[in-house]
């Protein structure tokens, strides 16, 4: 009977030399030569498996494949168009201002594109109402604006919002009068609403804190006179339009003049000099209006000279 085979088949020579002829029964007894050959075979097998298991021993018994760099997907920023779609209005505006500051040569191109756009009057009014609301929201909670006696602390808190609103108002008015806008009715209506917004702003107890309001109303008075001059020169509008339209503007202007302590007296007198009756009356009223306009321009020029010679506030938007 044959014994165990330890992974290989022994040759006939080793079998003959390792089996005793008698006295041991039928059991094979391996000799020293068999043990040595088996040890050499085991060592060769271990040497073959050693490079294969090198990484396994190095990483604590866990074999890992090294990732190939070409097979990974790397993150990347958004394209310019997608990024701009996600930016809000303030971010886009700040980006444009920064670009024009760093590259002044593009300011003219941007300005040309902007003035070529046709912004509706309603859009301008919506913006003005937002900025007017910001003025009211900046009032300190412990002071009531209904009494028109806000203190110095309230003026310091509200000043940035007031200047922003008045600057925006002046810019929009200049963009909605001739020759930018040829429709005199639309210009007068827009100026009427803007005047009402300024008149209704909360005022301060100290007269010097109301300087920006008063200065703005003076400028609005000049704009009123300018539009009335355009109306007087266009006799077709004077004769064709219903007189109730002009009387409505005059009535509202009279209310504004009372609330502004007479700062709108000059355009009010020009309106009263208009006669919406017969053509002869209209022509005579035009002559009297022209005399008033000459006086108005002389007064406006004198005021501008006084402002330039005097010490005006450096942050005023109306100088």
Curated annotation (Swiss-Prot):
Please indicate which superkingdom the organism of origin belongs to: Eukaryota
> Known Pfam families for this protein?
Cut8 (PF08559)
Location of this chain's protein in the cell:
Cytoplasm; Nucleus
- Give the record's keywords alphabetically: Cytoplasm, Nucleus, Protein transport, Transport
Q: Where is this region: Disordered?
A: 33-76
Q: Name one GO cellular component term.
A: cytoplasm
UniProt-recorded Gene Ontology molecular function terms: proteasome binding
Function recorded in the entry? Involved in ubiquitin-mediated protein degradation. Regulatory factor in the ubiquitin/proteasome pathway that controls the turnover of proteasome substrates. Targets proteasomes to the nucleus and facilitates the degradation of nuclear proteins. Required for efficient chromosome segregation. Restores protein transport and ribosomal RNA stability.
Other comments? Present with 2120 molecules/cell in log phase SD medium.
User: What does the sequence similarity comment in the record state about its family?
Assistant: Belongs to the cut8/STS1 family.
- Quote the protein name from its UniProt record: Tethering factor for nuclear proteasome STS1
Q: Which organism is it from?
A: Saccharomyces cerevisiae (strain ATCC 204508 / S288c)
- Organismal lineage: Eukaryota, Fungi, Dikarya, Ascomycota, Saccharomycotina
Which gene name does the record give? STS1
